[in-house]
Amino acid sequence: MLIVADENIPLLDSFFGDIGEIRRVNGRTLTPDQVKDADILLVRSVTRVDRQLLEGTRVRFVGTATIGTDHIDQTWLQEQGIGFAAAPGCNAVSVAEYVLSVLSLYAEKRGIEDWSSLTVGIVGVGNVGGELARMLERLDFTVKLCDPPRQEAEEERAEEFVPLAEALECDVVTLHTPLTRTGDHPTNRMIAGSELAALGQDQLLINAGRGEVIDGEALLARLQQADAPTVVLDVWEHEPRINPDLLDRVWLATPHIAGYSLEGKMQGTEMIYQALCRYLGLPVRKKAGQFLPEPALSKVSFTSSADEDEAVQVALRACYDPRRDDARLRLTMRGNPEERAQAFDRLRRDYPVRRECSSLKVQLKGSSKSIQDSFRAIGFKLKI
């Protein structure tokens, strides 16, 4: 059995080596000729999987190690009887921790002592948005949820959701929707001229969902105005050919890596491995946890005199500080458009190991229950 797999999916040999022969490929440039004799295709979000790629091939199962599926023509796969699986929620914790780190930096930038005084509007409350909401609420943030499809589908919970206009009134607006172009609530360019005009200079806009959810040209125009909001982008229109003018205008810019924790990537591999085993009728014998290495940083300590918010934010940034990825991206965005695109992909391919907060043991000496609860809300392991 031949498995053609994106070379950037981790632990391919560990999970799939005893199922079939593995052929590693560049997912961005994958061609029909490279998959014509494959039985299994494993991809990430950079590969468009449709009739053009797979017609006439032997492929009978497609797995994407991502939460998003807008790069997969699921209707065509179903018509052809080709099995399919994604990895919903695999990196939800990673993205939520990314947003929390951004919030900690934003509070510092604005001189806000109590970061939980910020109101946060979450647009898109699926696996990622839901995980973020749970963390924020445990940290005593005021959170407003906007998800029209869920609001309509879940009548018993309809009152928990607010319209987009109300979410846009929050101090922080963070986007976590899938990319959809049809239906009653398409998200393609959902945030455009009028929505951006509603955001002022005392607000923060974060996009760690899909680049095309924001109209890039409208955003660039808005950022050239004196009263523009502060903007953080992890995802971009037209990746990997991102707009360098937009890059220059945003506060923090990262190369689509919010979900790139080691745990998140390994869970993505594990989920498509499990789905393939079910498809083939094989027993599931492996779990991501058995392959996790010891973290480079395993412990931090705080005394009883530590300020609660400051201690939590120090530990959070010890695990992940987005300023490092921002600096790397800006340094590589030189040269012609093709060179910049290659640099963007290279940053993602060669991304350094990043661990989630659950990998870090926090020692608290003489601490209050309040600070213990705050650390637990984010997933840290406590030693009291």
Swiss-Prot record:
Binding positions for substrate? 45, 66, 260
The answer to whether the entry has keyword NAD is yes
SUPFAM superfamilies the UniProt entry points to: Formate/glycerate dehydrogenase catalytic domain-like, NAD(P)-binding Rossmann-fold domains
Write down the InterPro entries for this protein, in alphabetical order: D-isomer_2_OHA_DH_cat_dom, D-isomer_DH_CS1, D-isomer_DH_NAD-bd, Erythronate-4-P_DHase, Erythronate-4-P_DHase_dimer, NAD(P)-bd_dom_sf, PdxB_dimer_sf
For this chain, the annotated S-S bridges are: none
Q: One biological process GO term for this chain?
A: 'de novo' pyridoxal 5'-phosphate biosynthetic process
Predominant localisation class: cytoplasm
* Transmembrane annotation, as ranges: none
Name the pathway: Cofactor biosynthesis; pyridoxine 5'-phosphate biosynthesis; pyridoxine 5'-phosphate from D-erythrose 4-phosphate: step 2/5
Q: Name one GO cellular component term.
A: cytosol
* Protein family according to the UniProt entry: Belongs to the D-isomer specific 2-hydroxyacid dehydrogenase family. PdxB subfamily.
What is the protein name stated in its UniProt record?
Erythronate-4-phosphate dehydrogenase
Q: Which organism is it from?
A: Marinobacter nauticus (strain ATCC 700491 / DSM 11845 / VT8) (Marinobacter aquaeolei)
